[in-house]
């Protein structure tokens, strides 16, 4: 095992347009880091640079104490698991897992020991003589992970390994990945576009957007204190409500575009007259009968079983409130909603960055 360090790493294919803007990252020995973001944000490119499949434009990559920036992938001490399983269809499970070791010149007994140990960890012993066509999607992905495990790498790299699986199997494989990491404690860098995977697997999350690491933090930090409007809108399902407006001169009221006002229970006079974006998560909005509640006309109600989502408008801007499964107001009715002060987030509308009271 080893730590992973990226120092001022950038990537540009034409020397002009940056695909990856300067990123610095320190991954501790045994840490599980997940990079999450939309398609085209640069997360897979960054992973491929760590693997050596892409060259960095500037900056350095270290695995342990070794600078690996210019080393070939085979010399970096990494193992990679891809979205497609990349199994040899004519080989059985044992030979698929053993093939890389045979190429590297390992002896038969050493290969057998490593494959047997990986098969035990992944519960693949009964399947070692089967061909890939005889396996389910989840079993094939476990074989792909086993092929990586037998290499005993310093760093595991995962490139959206669960994307080809159905929803139920993804849940199962997430649990298996968590258990696998607890057993092996190998430094891991994992790429996904699925925020649920990111939040459930990661010890720390890197939220990527247009080649920039918008925020690096624990899942709790990213959820509770998003560093930017992008992070606030990307993490959470449904996403955080974001309302553009202006703070009144005395800092006591947030004024939306059509003049609707939301009282700020904790006045912020230092923001008086400033254009800001107010954020609050749907699950933090409370329905109330009190006069302090802000009225919202209910446009539609989504029944999700465990809870319900109430959709409406405030100041011409969409708002979603998560209600309990017992609350089933009729479309067209008026809800009175309360925004707890501790649940409010504020962002500079122009820069998109979080600001603190």
UniProtKB/Swiss-Prot annotation:
GO terms for molecular function: ABC-type glycerol-3-phosphate transporter activity; ATP binding; ATP hydrolysis activity. Its EC number is 7.6.2.10. It is a peripheral membrane protein. It holds the Pfam family OB_MalK. GO terms for biological process: carbohydrate transport; glycerophosphodiester transmembrane transport. The keyword Membrane applies. This is sn-glycerol-3-phosphate import ATP-binding protein UgpC. It comes from Yersinia pseudotuberculosis serotype I (strain IP32953). The lineage of its organism: Bacteria, Pseudomonadati, Pseudomonadota, Gammaproteobacteria, Enterobacterales.
